[in-house]
């Protein structure tokens, strides 16, 4: 995702082939995502992450370290040194996927749609050859999860 370029935006969607599998992914750009793209526009890539960090591993390492520091701190000792008490010591970038799937399940979004939204294959390899999953279901699921996070939708609908 960090290597996306402007040409990966096609008709209001981010389209790219995953390196690991070669599979084409197409994700609708919701207004909230467009706001992030606009705010963090990069020089060479869609986002400025690689303008700021030397490589993907450096970026992930720094982000995960920062996520682990979320939480209150207090000053201790004569020098007033900050002592952190992380709220979520195991928090990492992987939690975004886990959280999306959990929230989607709370909204009674079908497991098949959640699986597709995570980029997992549907059913057996043979079956998935004959089934073209309706991407609109994933688009709708993404919108519902975003609305739920912002308090615009209630669980159990």
Protein language model annotation of sequence segments:
Residues 44, 50-54, 81, 137-157:
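C-terminal secondary-structure termini that scaffold catalytic or DNA-interacting sites
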Residues 19-69:
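C-terminal catalytic core of Y-nucleophile DNA break-rejoin enzymes
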Residues 3-6, 14, 38-42, 71-75, ...:
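Hydrophobic alpha-helix feature that most strongly marks membrane-spanning transmembrane helices
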Residues 65-116, 120:
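Short, basic (Lys/Arg/His-rich) helix/loop patches that form interaction surfaces
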């Amino acid at each position: 995702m960090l290597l996306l370029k402007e040409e990966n935006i096609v008709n209001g969607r981010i389209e790219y082939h995953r390196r690991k599998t070669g599979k084409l992914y197409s994700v609708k750009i919701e207004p909230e995502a467009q706001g992030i793209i606009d705010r963090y526009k990069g020089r060479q890539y869609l986002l400025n992450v690689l303008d700021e960090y030397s490589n993907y591993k450096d970026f992930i390492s720094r982000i995960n370290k920062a996520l682990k520091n979320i939480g209150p701190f207090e000053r201790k000792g004569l020098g007033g040194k900050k002592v952190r008490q992380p709220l979520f010591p195991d928090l990492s970038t992987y939690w975004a996927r886990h959280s999306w799937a959990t929230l989607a399940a709370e909204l009674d979004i079908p497991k098949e749609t959640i699986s597709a939204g995570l980029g997992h294959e549907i059913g057996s390899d043979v079956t998935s050859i004959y089934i073209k999953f309706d991407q609109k279901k994933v688009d709708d699921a993404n919108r519902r999860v975003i609305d739920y996070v912002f308090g615009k939708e209630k669980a159990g609908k």
